[in-house]
Amino acid sequence: MAFILERAQAPQPASPATATLPVPTVQRLRRLNLAAAVFHLASAVLFLAIATDFDLPITASFPTEDPALTEQLFPAEVLTEVTIGYGVAAFSLLSALFHFLVATVANRPYNRAIAATQNPFRWIEYSLSSTLMIVLIVMLLGDYDIGALIGVAAANVAMILFGWLMERHNTPGADDVDWYPFVFGCIAGIAPWIVGTIYFAGALGNADEAVPTWVWALFISVFVMFNGFAVNQFLQYRRVGPWRSYVFGEGAYIALSFVAKTLLIWQVYFGTVR
């Protein structure tokens, strides 16, 4: 981990190692990260305190020659069950941990990275928390197959790593920005939503039961929020309006992360575990 952070914080030629942030900016970012840590922690603790147990299975299908299952060559077998409440609290706790780290013990390397228009801490946290989020989302939409869930997780991690690569190899506003990492990240990132859309559309096609309102809200709102991160990075590298400041984009990432996680937490609560 130390090697990864050291490499990630090494600035590119366009971002000199001597770059520093003004003291007011350092203080503002520290307060913002501390506030985010407190709110994420409070959300997780409150959720765990009031949520009831709600488990979903993780399944796998294996070929069989059981005569009793001649019409079902690949019956689904439950491997384990996941308590959704713990998963929901976990991604919020991960965010709280990373915000607390960059506001305290990792504050200096964080500030150096921000001055060099990079934030490796963000990408490491997202690779964990947002991946857990998207896996829980597709499970709530009805996908329990372990192979599909691993694919969803891998695609999301790839999206995050492409975002990190975009940041490592480019400088916002440069004439020679390489957009390939951004485009590849978008392609990888849409895969989990294709899986989710298949299950959501399948639920819509079920004439016997109406899709619960909370599922509509969950699918649409979190999809919009996830795409907000890509829009934020695009605006950073196009240097549009206030995004001319990398620090503004960093603040937008923090706000987007908090809103997306808060939406998911409470939509899950009102839809399933209350």
What are these regions (language model features)?
Residues F3-V38, A42-P120, T131-R274:
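Polytopic alpha-helical membrane-helix bundles and their juxtamembrane interface segments
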Residues R122-E125:
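Right-handed parallel beta-helix
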